[in-house]
């Protein structure tokens, strides 16, 4: 069981079962199957769904702020600021999606069309930290979905209910269930998922030691990883 102890009073705040092998397999399989349909969904439709996702998330702000305070020990008066940051970041990425995802013309000549095309990778595995659990995760989730990728989110064991709130908003918004999913995982299962051929990219925010483990897990595979590591960006 994944047990979260509140720093406020050292009480047991939440207790959630870790994902079983069958749940992990079903999640990977459904995400792998969904990636083609989501990739072929036009950008305007993806944007509409993600706008709804953000609105649905913010509509539950009072509950989210209370949970956030109890999970990580931040004064509740300061929790609203993170939700404002979530909204600002998400809206910026939504509003700039066409420009960011448009192909880049590198050179024109009479014989060839030279350009860089920005295509979806497939399934993105996002590993998010506890310290800014929404502001860090939105930086990975929203651009991944906008670009036509499916997302599987694994949140910190200190803030697992943040993943639950994001999933609740995604379901309410109409984003297909297999396009955005969450898993509660231990370290062993996390490494196995990273090594699975159905994961096409990893986005991790956390410690330097955690980043090293990510690199080890993808060491035998030809996939990329975005690592934001305690003031170090790779």
Language-model-derived ranges and their functions:
Residues 45, 49, 147-158, 162, ...:
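Short loop-to-beta-strand entry elements in the cores of soluble alpha/beta enzymes
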Residues 90, 163-166, 193, 214:
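Hydrophobic packing residues within well-ordered alpha-helices of enzyme cores
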Residues 105-176, 200:
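Conserved small-residue-rich beta-alpha loop and adjacent elements
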């Amino acid at each position: 069981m994944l047990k979260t102890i509140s720093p406020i009073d050292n009480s047991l705040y939440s207790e959630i079962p870790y994902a079983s092998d069958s749940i992990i397999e079903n999640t990977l399989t459904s995400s792998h199957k969904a990636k083609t349909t989501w990739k072929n969904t036009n950008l305007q439709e993806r944007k509409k769904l993600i706008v709804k996702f953000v609105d649905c998330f913010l509509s539950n702000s009072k509950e989210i702020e209370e949970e956030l305070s109890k999970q990580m020990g931040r004064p509740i008066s300061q929790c609203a600021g993170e939700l404002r940051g979530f909204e600002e970041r998400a809206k910026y990425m939504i509003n700039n999606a066409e420009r960011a995802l448009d192909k880049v013309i590198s050179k024109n000549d009479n014989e060839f069309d030279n350009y860089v095309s920005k295509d979806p990778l497939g399934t993105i595995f996002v590993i998010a930290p506890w310290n800014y659990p929404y502001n860090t995760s939105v930086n990975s989730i929203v651009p991944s979905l906008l670009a036509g990728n499916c997302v599987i989110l694994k949140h910190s064991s200190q803030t697992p209910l943040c993943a639950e709130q994001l999933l609740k908003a995604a379901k309410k918004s109409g984003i297909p269930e297999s396009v955005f999913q969450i898993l509660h995982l231990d370290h062993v299962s996390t490494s196995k998922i990273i090594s699975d051929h159905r994961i096409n990219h990893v986005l991790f925010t956390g410690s330097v030691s955690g980043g090293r483990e990510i690199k080890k897990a993808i060491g035998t595979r030809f996939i990329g990883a975005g690592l934001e590591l305690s003031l170090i960006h790779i």
